[in-house]
Amino acid sequence: MSFQTNYIHLADEILSGKTSISYEQALEILNSDENWWEIYAAALYLKNQVSRNNIRLNVLLSAKQGLCAENCGYCSQSKESTADIDKFGLLPQNVILKQAIVAHQNGASVFCIAMSGTKPSKREIEQLCQVIPEIKKSLPLEICLTAGFLDREQLHQLKQAGIDRINHNLNTPEENYPNIATTHSFKDRCDTLERIHNEDIDVCSGFICGMGESDEGLITLAFRLKELDPYSIPVNFLLAVEGTPLGKYNYLTPIKCLKIMAMLRFVFPFKELRLSAGREVHFENFESLVTLLVDSTFLGNYLTEGGRNQHTDIEFLEKLQLNHTKKELI
C-alpha cells in the first residue's frame, strides 16, 4: 500500500505545534508496504529533534512474584498459569535497596519495582513507604512502582514517601480485553490511572502488542492513552510463556513491530517512549532500528522472563552511539 501523507512534513508540523497525527494517518503507517522505510525515517527525524541521541535506562526488579488472583492470559504469575516460576512474597527492604544500588552502578536512571497481585496489603505498603525514602536519600534514581489496582489511600501514602511514578498498563484494546482477562475490566485499569493522576503522581502506562488486537484497536488504544497524559509509555511485545493461555500465541513479525513503534512515535512525540519486553525476540535484525526510535529501554531481565546481560545491553547502545545519560527529555 502506498500512502498519501508526507510524514517528514507531518513531523515538522507536529514539532511546531501546528498539528498532531490523525487516526487515519496512524492507520496508514501500520498498513504501509514498500514505502515503510520513509515513514521510519520521518519517525526517526521526529525523535532526534526532541531528544537527540539520548536514551534513558531502566532496571526492573520483580519484588513480589506469583501468587496472583488475577487471570491475565499473558502472565506467568496469574492464578491460571501453570508456568514453572519462582513464587515469593515482598522482598526484604535491604534486598530491594541492594538491587537499587546495583541498578545505579549499571547506569540506570530509573529503578522499577514490580509486585504481583491485585493490590498490595497494608503491611506491604508500609514496607514500600520505608524503602522508597531510603533509596531516594542514597541514590540519584527515579522510582517507578508496578503494584496493581492501587486505591486512593495507598497512592497518597506512596506520594508522601517520594514515589516518582506508578506503572499501570492498559495492555490491550477495550474490545479485546475480555479475551485477555475477566477478573477485572479495561475500565478498572482506566480508573486506576485516573486515581494516580488525581494524586499528582506521574503515570507510566503502555501496551502489550501481539495479543490478538486489530490495527484499528491498537490505534484507538494509543489515542485513549494519549488522553490520559502519561509521562512514559512502555511498549511490550508478547513474550509467549509456556503454561499460560497465550503460551503459543505469536503472529507478530519484525516489520510489523517496527511499524507499531513508528506509529507510536508520532502519537507520542514529546513523551518518553520505552522499548520493553520482547524486543530481543520480535525485532530480530531490526532491533537497532527500533532502539534509535525510543527514549528509554530496559537493562537486563523482565519479571519472570530473562532479557540480556546488562553489560551486553550497554555495549549494544554504545555501538549505536546512544548517550545513556540521566538527562530529562527536552
Curated annotation (Swiss-Prot):
Species annotation: Streptococcus agalactiae serotype V (strain ATCC BAA-611 / 2603 V/R)
CDD domains, A to Z: Radical_SAM
Described purpose of this protein according to its UniProt entry: Catalyzes the conversion of dethiobiotin (DTB) to biotin by the insertion of a sulfur atom into dethiobiotin via a radical-based mechanism.
Protein name according to UniProt: Biotin synthase
EC code(s) of this entry: 2.8.1.6
Subunit-structure text: Homodimer.
Residue ranges of the TM segments: none
SMART domains documented for this protein: BATS, Elp3
Residue intervals of the Radical SAM core domain: 53-276
Manner of cofactor binding, per the entry note: Binds 1 [4Fe-4S] cluster. The cluster is coordinated with 3 cysteines and an exchangeable S-adenosyl-L-methionine. Binds 1 [2Fe-2S] cluster. The cluster is coordinated with 3 cysteines and 1 arginine.
NCBIfam families referenced in this protein's UniProt entry, alphabetically: bioB
Superkingdom of origin: Bacteria
HAMAP family tied to this protein: BioB
Gene: bioB
GO biological process: biotin biosynthetic process
Pathway(s) this gene product operates in, as recorded in its UniProt entry: Cofactor biosynthesis; biotin biosynthesis; biotin from 7,8-diaminononanoate: step 2/2
Enzyme class: transferase
Annotated positions binding [4Fe-4S] cluster: C68, C72, C75
Cofactor: [4Fe-4S] cluster; [2Fe-2S] cluster
Family: Belongs to the radical SAM superfamily. Biotin synthase family.
Catalyses which reaction(s): (4R,5S)-dethiobiotin + (sulfur carrier)-SH + 2 reduced [2Fe-2S]-[ferredoxin] + 2 S-adenosyl-L-methionine = (sulfur carrier)-H + biotin + 2 5'-deoxyadenosine + 2 L-methionine + 2 oxidized [2Fe-2S]-[ferredoxin]
Residues annotated to bind [2Fe-2S] cluster: C112, C144, C204, R274
PROSITE patterns xref list: RADICAL_SAM
InterPro entries from the UniProt entry: Aldolase_TIM (IPR013785), BATS_dom (IPR010722), Biotin_synth/BioAB (IPR002684), Biotin_synthase (IPR024177), Elp3/MiaA/NifB-like_rSAM (IPR006638), rSAM (IPR007197)
